[in-house]
Curated annotation (Swiss-Prot):
Record's subcellular location: Cytoplasm
One GO cellular component term noted in the UniProt record for this chain: cytoplasm
Protein's name according to its UniProt entry: S-adenosylmethionine:tRNA ribosyltransferase-isomerase
The species this protein was found in: Azotobacter vinelandii (strain DJ / ATCC BAA-1303)
Family: Belongs to the QueA family.
Coiled coil: none
GO annotation terms (biological process): queuosine biosynthetic process; tRNA wobble guanine modification
Domain of life: Bacteria
UniProt xrefs under Pfam families: Queuosine_synth
General function of this protein: Transfers and isomerizes the ribose moiety from AdoMet to the 7-aminomethyl group of 7-deazaguanine (preQ1-tRNA) to give epoxyqueuosine (oQ-tRNA).
SUBUNIT field: Monomer.
Key word Transferase present: yes
Length: 349
């Protein structure tokens, strides 16, 4: 399959650069995976598409204010984007500067604090701070808005680029499908006898990296840490026993569940994943998906195409563009039921 098969034209005006005033005020494009039919709804209408006995699986990662500004002790400004917290004081980070810092060099942090560059690991720098990392980031860090939100972060982003159920700090990008849920909607979901469970996948900056090969099969995914606990495995088993559907909230929840069931059996899992889901790969756990609209030629669009079918997905995206849906992290959402016989690009007439 060619990466170019997943291209579509997107007007700049449809990229959402700010969230709506209310989380569930977004639009919802419903795609029936069996028939390919589309419905244009509001996100609050998601309740109409859930059934008693279903299980919704959320990603409870918490976005850290991972972007720091500073300068080398020897002179020269730089920008740090923390990719992964290794321990209380060490991180792996992207460093943008006119000249990369060398091992042993000191970095002064705007707002207070400093770090030492310990080693370079390919594109990432291992840094050690002079204090605990997470409190430092909370104090002087900036929310790591995606590159397509071309504005400085604002105070409101601390709340809105975060799900209301975020619990475990470590992500440098939000699991954006979850941004549409507020406390009232979550309560209404529970009142409908829809169960909930939580996985953790700390979304890395690699989620925004373009695919740099021509053929999908040649692409290697970035690694991200996740955890699927025994309670999630038990919740899925109980859902199956009562005839419910497993509804993944976001592609990160899909990748978590399917990583923990690579051999077809869902088991507890904690560790790194580099799972790459594209057309032709089977799904062992997920029956329905809540997701935002993704970038052209992105691995996340490929995942959605694997789930809903390539022609159905691209037709839905064309309809979304024509209807003026808002795209990407602060944009609108889709609710998709799994296509039992999804077609890949080569199979499309």
């Amino acid at each position: 399959m060619r990466v170019a098969d997943f291209h579509f034209e997107l007007p700049e005006s449809l990229i959402a650069r700010h969230p709506l005033a209310e989380r569930r005020a977004s639009r919802l494009l419903v795609l029936d995976g069996v028939t390919g039919d589309l419905q244009h709804r509001r996100f609050a209408d998601l309740l109409d598409h859930l059934r008693p006995g279903d299980l919704m699986v959320f990603n409870n990662t918490r976005v850290i204010p991972a972007r720091l500004f500073g300068w080398k002790a020897s002179g020269g400004k730089l920008e740090i984007l923390v990719e992964r917290v290794l321990d209380d004081e060490r991180v792996l980070a992207h460093v943008r500067a006119s000249k990369s810092p060398k091992a042993g060099s000191r970095i002064l942090i705007e707002g207070g604090g400093e770090a030492q560059m310990l080693a370079r690991h390919d594109a990432l720098f291992e840094l050690r701070f002079d204090q605990r990392v997470l409190p430092l980031l909370e104090r002087v860090g900036h929310m790591p808005l995606p590159p397509y939100i071309d504005r400085p972060d604002e105070a409101a982003d601390r709340e809105r680029y975060q799900t209301v159920y975020a619990a475990r700090a470590g992500a440098v990008a939000a699991p954006t499908a979850g941004l549409h849920f507020d406390e009232a909607l979550l309560a209404a979901i529970g009142e409908k006898d829809v169960a909930t469970a939580f996985v953790t996948l700390h979304v890395g900056a690699g989620t925004f990296q373009p695919v740099r090969v021509e053929r999908i099969e040649d692409h290697h995914m970035h690694r991200e840490w996740l955890e699927v606990g025994q309670e999630v495995v038990d919740a899925v088993a109980a859902c199956r026993a009562r005839g419910g559907r497993v509804v993944a909230v976001g592609t990160t929840s899909v990748r978590s569940l399917e990583s923990a069931a690579r051999d077809g059996v869902l088991r507890p899992f904690s560790g790194d994943t580099d799972i790459f889901i594209y057309p032709g790969r089977p799904f062992h756990v997920v029956d329905a998906l809540v997701t935002n609209f993704h970038l052209p030629e992105s691995t996340l669009l490929m995942l959605v195409s694997a789930f809903a079918g390539y022609p159905e997905t691209m037709a839905a995206y064309a309809a979304a563009v024509a209807q003026g849906y808002r795209f990407f992290s602060y944009g609108d959402a889709m609710f998709i039921t799994r296509n039992p016989a999804p077609r890949a690009p080569e199979e499309t007439p």
